[in-house]
Design a protein with these regions (language model features):
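Short, low-complexity, polar/charged sequence segments that are solvent-exposed and flexible
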Residues: 84-90, 118-122, 156-160
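Intrinsically disordered, low-complexity terminal/linker regions enriched in Pro/Ser/Gly
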Residues: 148-162
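Solvent-exposed edge beta-strands and adjacent loop segments
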Residues: 1-72, 119-132
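Short beta-strand and beta-hairpin "edge-sheet" elements
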Residues: 35, 100-146
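Extracellular/virion structural assembly segments
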Residues: 50-116, 146-151
């Protein structure tokens, strides 16, 4: 990793694509973005050891409780409102997630950022009319593909790692 200093909030970018959309929509008007890694740790009590051993088996990252400020003119709200209003479930609630990490200083020279891509279930949780927020979760489905992203005109293009 190149560079120094604290990572800024705008350097972790969440993009979603739902339905028959061709391009990703960046989630811009959320006021929080926390990625929960959800480590799956198992304890094994091997007969040759005095104390049990903890083994990290896997991660199941997800984003929960993402509060989006509802601006009528914003594409991110329009996309999520379509899911909420339509009460979409099953396959209609599945989209594509692209999580782009724009804080590697090396990207300035390569024009590529590290990223994760995965199908994801988008779960609408709460519409708070008083606060003007729509809260939702993004839960990746299956394997998360690591790779890089280039951006042209605000549209990201994902390339899986070799």
């Amino acid at each position: 990793m190149e560079g120094t200093g604290k990572v800024k909030k705008y350097e972790v970018a969440l993009f979603l694509k739902t339905g028959k959309a061709v391009n990703y929509t960046r989630i811009k008007k959320a006021t929080d973005l926390k990625i929960e890694f959800n480590a799956d740790v198992h304890e094994y009590d091997y007969i040759a050891d005095v104390s049990p051993t903890s083994e990290l088996e896997k991660y199941k990252p997800q984003i929960t409780g993402l509060p989006l400020t509802m601006y009528r003119e914003e594409p991110d709200f329009a996309m999520l409102w379509d899911l909420a209003y339509g009460l979409k479930v099953g396959g209609e609630a599945v989209g594509e997630m692209l999580l782009v990490y724009k804080f590697d200083e090396d990207a300035e020279t390569t024009g590529q950022w590290k990223a994760w891509s995965a199908p994801a279930t988008i779960i609408i949780k709460t519409l708070d009319a008083v606060e003007g927020k729509l809260e939702f979760d993004v839960q990746p489905r299956g394997t998360i593909t690591q790779g890089t992203v280039t951006e042209s005109g605000g549209n990201p293009t994902f390339q899986p790692a070799a």
